[in-house]
């Protein structure tokens, strides 16, 4: 399987985003099979983590918008990153199953809880890119926290600017995640880069458009300051669970994007349907 090398077709942006939003609703039963056991296992873990960090998060959110808030913003980013690492095995497993369902109609079993080689490779790729983006974008803040030397605002701005082109590159390469999920080792990073040429902004803004609605329930974090520890922990846990389910929209976008640039051959789909379980 290889992409069109002459002139890559432009991704139909809004149609793809709309289809990505429709997928979880259209296949809600399958989504339930993919997620319910993982969510059940992760809920107590998330609740424990949220209980531990709730006082710190509440304090940070209370300082947002103040001068003190500028110095603690990196702490909120770090806490978010740590939670992402904890969630990564579950999220990667769910994403791989969802990719395979959308593209090759592979039906997950009702007690889906799988971590195989594809899931590990998927999670590793996400982890590496996240560490690089997070490290470069917040390098001045992390270095200041480690050394006690406060960096000027222009240095923080430069770090953010440097992270932007890297973010665009990561977006262009993102369909490789789908190839990993499908176990298609014949698709290389070079193939993905060539196939997505002239689609950089679509690849970058597509996932953003698919997760932007998650900011609506996230607004409740600004009210954590008035909650007790248990309530704050419950809210943080609920937001994490919503983000996992809502993130499936972004996974759907990647699947549809991959199908656009790398059309699936009929015999591949048929093999997936009749393959023994």
Please give the residue ranges for each predicted region:
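Nonpolar helix-loop interface/hinge motif
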Residues: 1-54, 163-232, 243, 267
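Juxtamembrane transition segments at transmembrane-helix termini in multipass membrane proteins
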Residues: 2-3, 56, 60-77, 86-90, ...
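Residue-level signature of the transmembrane alpha-helical core
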Residues: 35-39, 81, 85, 123, ...
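Alpha-helical membrane-spanning segments of integral membrane proteins, especially the hydrophobic core
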Residues: 76-84, 109-138, 155-163
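Interfacial transmembrane-helix boundary/kink motif in multi-pass membrane proteins
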Residues: 27, 31-35, 104-130, 191-194, ...
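Membrane-helix interface motif
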Residues: 48-65, 134-147, 220-226
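Membrane-interfacial helix-loop-helix connectors in multipass membrane proteins
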Residues: 145-158, 225-237
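Specific transmembrane helices
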Residues: 46-54, 79-104, 125-142
């Amino acid at each position: 399987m290889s992409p069109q090398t002459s002139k890559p077709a432009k991704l139909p942006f809004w149609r793809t985003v709309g289809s990505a939003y429709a997928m979880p609703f259209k296949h809600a039963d399958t989504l339930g099979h993919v997620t319910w056991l993982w969510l059940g296992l992760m809920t107590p873990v998330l609740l424990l983590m949220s209980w531990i960090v709730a006082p710190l998060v509440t304090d940070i959110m209370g300082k947002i918008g103040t001068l003190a808030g500028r110095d603690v913003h990196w702490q909120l980013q770090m806490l978010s990153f740590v939670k992402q690492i904890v969630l990564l095995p579950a999220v990667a497993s769910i994403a791989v199953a969802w990719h395979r369902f959308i593209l090759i109609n592979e039906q997950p079993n009702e007690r889906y809880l799988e971590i195989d080689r594809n899931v590990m490779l998927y999670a590793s790729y996400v982890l590496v890119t996240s560490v690089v983006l997070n490290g470069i974008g917040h390098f001045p803040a992390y270095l200041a926290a480690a050394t006690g030397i406060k960096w000027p605002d222009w240095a923080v701005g430069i770090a953010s600017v440097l992270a932007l082109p890297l973010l665009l590159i990561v977006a262009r390469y993102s369909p490789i995640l789908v190839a990993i999920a499908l176990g298609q080792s014949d698709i290389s990073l070079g193939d993905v880069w060539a196939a997505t040429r002239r689609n950089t902004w679509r690849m970058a803004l597509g996932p953003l458009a698919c997760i932007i609605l998650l900011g609506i329930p996230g607004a409740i974090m600004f009210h954590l300051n008035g909650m007790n520890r248990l309530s704050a922990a419950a809210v943080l846990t609920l937001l994490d669970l919503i983000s996992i389910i809502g993130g499936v929209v972004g996974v759907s976008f990647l699947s549809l994007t991959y199908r656009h640039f790398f059309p699936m051959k009929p015999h591949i789909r048929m093999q997936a349907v009749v393959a023994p379980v």
